[in-house]
Design a protein with these regions (language model features):
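Conserved alpha/beta-hydrolase "nucleophile elbow" surrounding the catalytic nucleophile
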Residues: 68, 152, 156-158
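Conserved HGGG/HGGXW glycine-rich cap/lid loop of the alpha/beta-hydrolase fold
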Residues: 46-119
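Conserved serine/cysteine hydrolase catalytic core
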Residues: 235-242
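Flexible "cap/lid" loop of the alpha/beta hydrolase fold
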Residues: 162-169, 178-207
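Conserved acidic catalytic loop of the alpha/beta-hydrolase fold
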Residues: 121-152
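Short beta-strand immediately N-terminal to the catalytic nucleophile in serine-hydrolase-like folds
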Residues: 136, 154-156, 181
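Residue in the alpha/beta-hydrolase core beta-strand immediately N-terminal to the catalytic nucleophile
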Residues: 96, 153, 177-179
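N-terminal cap/lid segment of alpha/beta-hydrolase-fold proteins
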Residues: 29-50
């Protein structure tokens, strides 16, 4: 396991966060910024986990399951994207992954010692994780079962793209299409890294917009779950051949 594991996740998070900041920082977005938040949350126990979710759109329209990334809740998808999909004739399923947002939090597991787990992975030893991407993919499919949705377009961003890949690999009959956004099937060969200038711009954008944990929560970001979810990614390994 290379240090690129953390680099990939970190860059994915920064891109995800920058995308969200840009999505909400327009007059149109501000005008409609409460649409998703205003919808009542539903809860269902699926795969032995309580999942918080929302469904927008007509029951007979093709379903789109949106899977968010590392430590992030469903609100980061933003009203503009979601409402454009609804207006285009899709039924949108939004939900919070296990251990983040309003879904069941798994704080009883505590925080992994990341440096130790990464060191173990670096030298080929098995790492410890409280759950895997496959578990999170099963949560997604179980939610579709709960909603009586036989098939859906599966869309994931960052770590959500990894979960979406696992859904497509393990449950191909449930997938109409797969959209994996700013994600990766594993930690092997990579595209060239971003320039220092681009990386600094993303980092500074995040620093400028966020000054404390309460603000992060308002934006739908839950830092407490990130170490456990990073371990889920590392534990799950590579999906390139899948």
């Amino acid at each position: 396991m290379k240090k690129s594991a953390i680099l990939t996740l970190s860059m994915g998070f920064l891109l995800l966060f920058a995308w969200h900041i840009q999505a909400i920082d327009t007059p149109e977005a501000r005008e409609h910024a409460t649409k998703i938040r205003a919808l009542a949350l539903s809860h269902a126990t699926v795969n032995n986990i309580e999942i918080a979710y929302k469904v927008i759109g007509e029951d007979d329209h093709p379903a789109v399951l949106l899977i968010m990334g590392l430590g992030a809740s469903h609100i980061l998808w933003g009203d503009n994207l979601v409402m454009q999909l609804v207006d285009a004739g899709y039924r949108i399923v939004l939900f919070d992954n296990r251990d983040t947002g309003d879904s069941q939090r798994l704080e009883e597991f505590g925080q992994p010692l990341l440096w130790w787990q990464l060191l173990k992975a670096r030298f080929g030893f098995d790492v410890d994780a409280d759950y895997t991407l496959e578990d999170m993919a099963q949560d997604s499919v179980a939610l579709l079962d709960e909603l009586d949705i036989e098939q859906a377009h599966i869309v994931g961003a960052s770590m959500g793209g990894m979960i979406a890949q696992a859904v497509a690999s393990n449950h191909p009959s449930r997938v109409l299409s797969l959209v994996s956004i700013m994600s990766t099937p594993g930690f092997g060969d990579h595209l060239p890294p971003p320039s220092t200038e681009a990386n600094d711009q993303l980092t500074n954008m995040a620093k400028d917009k966020v000054d404390n944990k309460a603000r992060l929560r308002q934006l739908g970001i839950y830092t407490e779950s990130m170490p456990r979810q990073i371990m889920a990614v590392i534990k799950s390994g590579d999906r390139t051949e899948a």
